Design a protein with these regions (language model features):
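Positively charged, amphipathic and often flexible ligand-engagement surfaces
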Residues: 1-361
Length: 361
């Protein structure tokens, strides 16, 4: 093993180098340069497992701050659970205070950054969401920080997961907060709408405790709720207060968002968001149509590449699922590939036709 494992790790990094980058590597700066040349933005997310102690939480916080200090970086995601250890759901108020105190320096740096570097605008901080039990906590922390006077002029964002039924009430809460904030002279906020990528862990947690699962039971329910969230967010009376990141590789969902926004005259309200390294052809077409494209880009510390495995497993699990859009998009019948009589993409038997049928339901 001492001989094979280092070789396997190097090969693994070569294979997934287009999906996950070193946080301080030359490849990241090359990618940032390329994104800027293509008029794209990269949303950098520092990968890592759940923190168990204060020392690891502090290290993760400093690593995130190091990303923000890089003048080429203008967009960073951070999870509440990654910078504070041992969050206790029974001590909600205490957990909020700890998180606000820990995250405040990141937002303060963003406010001060344009005056301290070549930046012309503050870097964007996106408060990420993962586990269901962090939903209310993350919402409260987000609102608490952005309600402080020193951050009223800072535009920042938060994530909502459509596979949680609670996301509808959460979005309504964020809309009210955003409208109140802009009415008081503050900057708009942004909500990044995702389908949700933590289903397996939510299932394990619920089943091991005998609880009802927090997410929807089916992909169809999640997709329907995603459209419900888009319908509530993309409105003329909200557009000046709330920006919407439409984060999906499902072209039906993306098209629905774009057409809805255009029909309501709020097409400038949305950003198209996709995953770095996945479906580049579709990314190009969507950027040409929408005009604004943000790529979610995972990065890892060079010495901690092992933490990227869980992210890669989630991506593999999602893309391998037959109900997933990317699976349907890349599924080509073997006989068709060989020039046979397999079903065409428009055939009722094709995976893509199945995707369209579920969308129209």
């Amino acid at each position: 093993p001492w001989l094979v494992i280092p070789i396997a790790r190097r090969r693994m990094r070569q294979l997934v180098g287009h999906l996950i980058l070193d946080s301080d590597g030359e490849a990241l700066h090359q990618l940032l340069d390329d994104a800027r040349a293509r008029d794209r933005r990269l949303n950098l997310n520092l990968l890592g497992e759940a923190v168990l102690g204060a020392k690891e939480a502090e290290r993760r916080l400093q690593d995130t701050m190091a990303l923000l200090r890089d003048p080429m970086v203008d967009y960073v995601s951070v999870k509440a659970s990654s910078v504070v250890s041992q969050l206790n759901p029974w001590d909600f108020d205490g957990s909020v205070e700890r998180l606000v105190g820990t995250l405040r320096p990141l937002y303060r740096f963003a406010v001060d950054a344009p005056g301290q570097s070549s930046r012309t605008a503050p870097p964007f901080i996106n408060l990420d969401m993962e586990e269901y039990h962090d939903l209310d906590l993350t919402l409260e922390v987000f609102e608490r920080i952005l309600s402080e006077d020193e951050f009223m002029g800072l535009e920042a964002g938060i994530v909502l997961q459509a596979y949680l039924p609670d996301s509808v009430a959460a979005l309504d809460r964020l809309i009210d907060f955003a409208r109140d904030r802009t009415a008081r002279g503050g900057a708009p906020v942004k909500v990044r709408l995702v389908k949700g990528a933590n289903l397996s862990m939510e299932t394990v947690t619920a089943d091991s405790h005998g609880w009802v699962r927090a997410p929807y039971a089916t992909k169809a329910e999640t997709d329907a709720n995603y459209l419900r969230l888009l319908d509530r967010a993309l409105r003329p009376d909200v557009a000046d207060s709330l920006r919407v990141g439409v984060a999906s590789h499902n072209l039906f969902s993306m098209a629905a968002a774009v057409e809805l926004a255009r029909a309501r005259g709020v097409d400038k309200q949305i950003d198209a968001e996709m995953l770095q390294g996945m479906a580049p052809t579709q990314q190009k077409v969507i950027q040409e149509d929408v005009g604004r494209l943000i790529l979610y880009t995972p990065v890892v510390d060079a010495d901690s590449f092992d933490v990227a495995v869980s992210y890669l497993v989630r991506r593999l699990e999602e893309n391998a699922a037959e109900e997933n859009f990317l699976h349907a998009m890349t599924s080509v019948d073997e006989s068709e590939r060989a020039g046979g009589d397999g079903p065409s993409p428009k055939s009722p038997q094709s995976p893509m036709s199945g995707q369209e049928a579920r969308f129209r339901q």
